[in-house]
Amino acid sequence: NFFKSKTAIITLFAACFVVLISLGVRQVFGLFFIDFNESLNVSNTAFGFAIGIQMLMWGLTGPIFGALADKYGGHVAIISAFIFYTLGIYFLYTGPNTGIFFQIHMGLLIGIGLGGTAISIPMSVVGKHFPLSTRTIAMSIVTALGSFGYFLSPIFTNYSLKEYGWNYTLFIFSLVLITGLIAAYFV
């Protein structure tokens, strides 16, 4: 009785996957600091400033993606946001990724991407597919999977940084974000 339709099932699973990826990747940027400092000469201040821009853009673009979701559907908003997020990670991987470009990629692009992929848009879409009696359970499942991303991503990132280095780890993140972009079509 929990799932009223196949659309609700698909939306719930897709939203869980989107949030797991989005929040998981976002949570591990601090693990890259030493590598960014040594390889790209990024200072503590520059790294902190980029993360500050990222948080600011996340907050500023959330309502924009919310309006986009209301007008065109949640999948359009989340796909659009994943494009920004993926480009930010990909450009960090390929470069140029020093100076102002570090701020643009790590701060601006990823922050814009988080505005539509992090949790608010996927949860609101899931909420529309469930009746009031089961809505909180469905939204709790999405939140729990986001928390699981917080747990899983640092484990993978530590392993990947030690085995393959920061460049290849960012490349893997780009591929993971592309799978999130595909899953967003079903939200």
Feature annotation, model-predicted:
Residues 10-44, 62-65, 154:
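Extracytoplasmic
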Residues 142-187:
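Helix-loop-helix hairpin linking two adjacent transmembrane segments in secondary transporters
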Residues 36, 116-130:
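Intracellular juxtamembrane helix-capping segments at the cytosolic ends
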